[in-house]
Amino acid sequence: EERPYGRTTNLQTLFRPPGGRFVGEMDLHWDADRLAFTMPDETGWHVYELTLDAQGHPAAPARRLTPQVEDADHFDPCYTSDGGLVFASTANMTAVPCWHGKQKACSLYRIGPDGSVRQLCFDQDLDLHPSVLADGQVVYSRWDYSGTMHMYLRPLMAMNPDGTGQRAIFGSNAYWPNAAYFPRQVPGEPGRVAAVVCGYHGVNRMGELVVLDVDGSGKVPAGLLHRFPGRSVSSLDDVRDNLVDNSWPKFLHPQPLSSRYVLVSAQVAGNAPWGIYLADMFGNLVPVWVEADRDCFEPIPLRRTPRPPAPTDRVQPHRTDALV
């Protein structure tokens, strides 16, 4: 098949959802033999898994991993290094205050290696975009709807896969950025993650592509290492609600290859399609796959990667008291 910009490649469909259903929010296992993703069925939104063979071809039909819970949706999965899976769910039955309960909120849950399901987060509002850091902890975005300045309270959090040790690692007690979404560990560089920063209202979870230091104090501006493409760290005095509405290009779904190169979904202008690009810190935004009549999202290199260590599970479900 002819690829844009004069090169050729072989495209392969790994999975075609029945009935044209949505399929996305993908996470590839470190062994590259399993792909978890979100897809709806007749009962709601669920997490599914596709098994892959050594050549990256589907080895079996996709199977559903999450249980059916009345009036609840499950989505946004990530594998954990201890053999479990973390995902978001509306089974907590909470809602966003400013919508007077009409819009559901979600918390993070865990499927253990034994198949058991347990709630990890008990926040008032949304916990989103879990992924795994180099030390095996889970990083995610949390929205704290509290106080008069809640439009600036969406820090990056980290916790152990069992839900213990929850703490803010970037953006706490700061006015910039309003939010950081889609955090992903930079390979081979512990303490650094790629993410998309954006405002509170305005465009939805799309914005500027950055690399952050989450091993230090988590403070701004010291924690901001780079903004792409090719933009060095500059003044962060632009504190406002609709932070990135007029910022181009806009980014989604970063997959860092290093702190200098990030495979990412990008829209270069308001009338342009979303495509797959390679962004680098030298100012380049190289198109990898762009089609005029459709949008392309969520690039993931289909390859094996080193598995992080598995933190010790410290939860004791049989206890009837709390241990602090």
What residue ranges belong to the model's regions?
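Conserved beta-propeller blade repeats
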Residues: 20-29, 34-35, 71-84, 124-139, ...
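Structural motif
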Residues: 43-49, 95-99, 103-107, 148-157, ...
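Surface beta-strand/loop "capping" patches
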Residues: 303-324
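Multi-bladed beta-propeller domains
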Residues: 5-22, 51-73, 112-125, 160-179, ...
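Solenoidal tandem-repeat scaffolds enriched in leucines and small polar residues
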Residues: 68-169, 173
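Blade/loop signatures of beta-propeller domains
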Residues: 1-9, 97, 105
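Loop/turn-rich, solvent-exposed surfaces of beta-rich toroidal or solenoidal domains
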Residues: 141, 182-278
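Residue position within the beta-strands of beta-propeller blades
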Residues: 34-38, 49, 85-90, 138-143, ...
